[in-house]
């Protein structure tokens, strides 16, 4: 139940709030798409992963490809290169 509520909340953000501002995510997949995948893979712990990702998404990082890891982690996915661009 909680998982579905979180997914609906993120999808509502993607549909109604995100289009109001220019694209600014430095990662691929976007932070909201990352949050959805993290919640689907890791349940409610995925919200922590999504928040950690949002906190990493700022102008002082290179960004790049950063998929959701298979195991729960609040760190950037170590299987991808920091210099890998999308």
Swiss-Prot record:
Location in or out of the cell: Cell membrane
Entries under Pfam families matching the protein: YidD
Keywords, sorted A to Z: Cell membrane, Membrane
Keyword Cell membrane applies: yes
A GO-annotated cellular component: plasma membrane
Main localization, broad class: membrane
Alphabetical list of SMART domains matching this protein: Haemolytic (SM01234)
Membrane topology (UniProt): Peripheral membrane protein
InterPro entries: Membr_insert_effic_factor_YidD
Record PANTHER family: MEMBRANE PROTEIN INSERTION EFFICIENCY FACTOR-RELATED (PTHR33383:SF1)
Family membership noted in the UniProt record: Belongs to the UPF0161 family.
NCBIfam families recorded: membrane protein insertion efficiency factor YidD (TIGR00278)
Protein role: Could be involved in insertion of integral membrane proteins into the membrane.
Protein known as: Putative membrane protein insertion efficiency factor
Species: Streptococcus pyogenes serotype M18 (strain MGAS8232)
